[in-house]
């Protein structure tokens, strides 16, 4: 829909008329609409309940011989928006950056060298088409700044963009470390002299997760079989984007490997938590408890 060839069909009524005109019999039809947010007007964005496109999609889904797939930019249409619009009749298909196994099947060569390349530039598919390191770095940095960050700022009307930027840097530089909104807020105040509430930090963390830049693993009490509300570990959805954000500095091998393994487990549809076990130790007659 981002191609001007299809500009006419950004009008929801025209789109509906065009698609229905192609459904001429009882055969199965598969409809794929990419960048579907172009069919949503600015006025409709202000009043999501009036988005005409959702009615068009729901109408098509009622047809027994139609299977419809839509994708959209994060800033205009997140997964939860689509699922809400489909009123329980839609399914989410999670597509991750390519795994190391997929990367190696395309890259080939020495496996150790391939892993070093993957640990540096990650698994965004277009990275493989870039001819040299400079092009790869530039692509990932532009993708982070011009696509992901702009999506977040446009969708959520960020009132403190500087805080969002500092928060993102903090998460990227400490992947795999336990943290929470209060801790981050205190760090920003003491190190950067930025006063911000933990509530704002918590809200921004959710924005980063909803926009698929990060995901988090909650702490789970293995013995008590319960989740701790905080702290959690945060991981970048793609390690190449993490490195690009940090200008390819801070190449901490163990943290990067942990992030890659975490992403691999998600790709294999595992639910990943941070296990916590409480241990009681006795020293000089005194009993102490610690978590590990």
Task: Locate each region found by the language model.
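Short glycine-rich substrate-engagement loop in P-loop NTPases that contacts/grips substrate
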Residues: 1-27, 51
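Conserved catalytic network of the ASCE P-loop NTPase/AAA+ motor domain
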Residues: 21-26, 59-66, 85
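Interdomain motor-coupling "hinge/lid" segment immediately C-terminal to the ATP-binding subdomain
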Residues: 65, 73-75, 79-178
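Catalytic P-loop NTPase motifs of RecA-like helicase/translocase cores
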Residues: 4-7, 37-42, 77-78
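Conserved Walker B catalytic segment
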Residues: 32, 36-69
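Short, glycine/charged-enriched secondary-structure capping and boundary segments
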Residues: 13-15, 45-49, 53, 83-88, ...
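Accessory nucleic acid-recognition modules appended to NTPase machines
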Residues: 133-291
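The start of beta-strands in P-loop NTPase/AAA+ ATPase cores
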Residues: 29-30, 233
